[in-house]
Swiss-Prot record:
<dbReference type="GO" id="GO:0019843">
    <property type="term" value="F:rRNA binding"/>
</dbReference>
<keyword id="KW-0694">RNA-binding</keyword>
<protein>
    <recommendedName>
        <fullName>Large ribosomal subunit protein bL31</fullName>
    </recommendedName>
</protein>
<dbReference type="GO" id="GO:0003735">
    <property type="term" value="F:structural constituent of ribosome"/>
</dbReference>
<dbReference type="GO" id="GO:1990904">
    <property type="term" value="C:ribonucleoprotein complex"/>
</dbReference>
<comment type="function">
    <text>Binds the 23S rRNA.</text>
</comment>
<keyword id="KW-0689">Ribosomal protein</keyword>
<dbReference type="GO" id="GO:0005840">
    <property type="term" value="C:ribosome"/>
</dbReference>
<dbReference type="InterPro" id="IPR042105">
    <property type="entry name" value="Ribosomal_bL31_sf"/>
</dbReference>
<keyword id="KW-0687">Ribonucleoprotein</keyword>
<dbReference type="Pfam" id="PF01197">
    <property type="entry name" value="Ribosomal_L31"/>
</dbReference>
<dbReference type="InterPro" id="IPR002150">
    <property type="entry name" value="Ribosomal_bL31"/>
</dbReference>
<keyword id="KW-0699">rRNA-binding</keyword>
<dbReference type="InterPro" id="IPR027491">
    <property type="entry name" value="Ribosomal_bL31_A"/>
</dbReference>
<comment type="subunit">
    <text>Part of the 50S ribosomal subunit.</text>
</comment>
<dbReference type="InterPro" id="IPR034704">
    <property type="entry name" value="Ribosomal_bL28/bL31-like_sf"/>
</dbReference>
<dbReference type="GO" id="GO:0006412">
    <property type="term" value="P:translation"/>
</dbReference>
Amino acid sequence: MKAEIHPNYHSITVVMTDGTEYVTRSTWGNEGDKLNLDIDSKSHPAWTGGQQQMLDRGGRVSRFQKKFSGFLKKD
């Protein structure tokens, strides 16, 4: 096996959408970095039963809704 081909595995702090933090080990970033989550299990509709709204990243959802707004409407 080749030496030094594995990524650096270190501790980081993950910040949830509600501000809670926990420390885990990851290959992301550098030792001690903070990873701020945009969506997590406390804010994603799949885990909240649809009570939270998804963020519209880059207007994708609004463009889709505009494009197909009258698609299934019955007169």
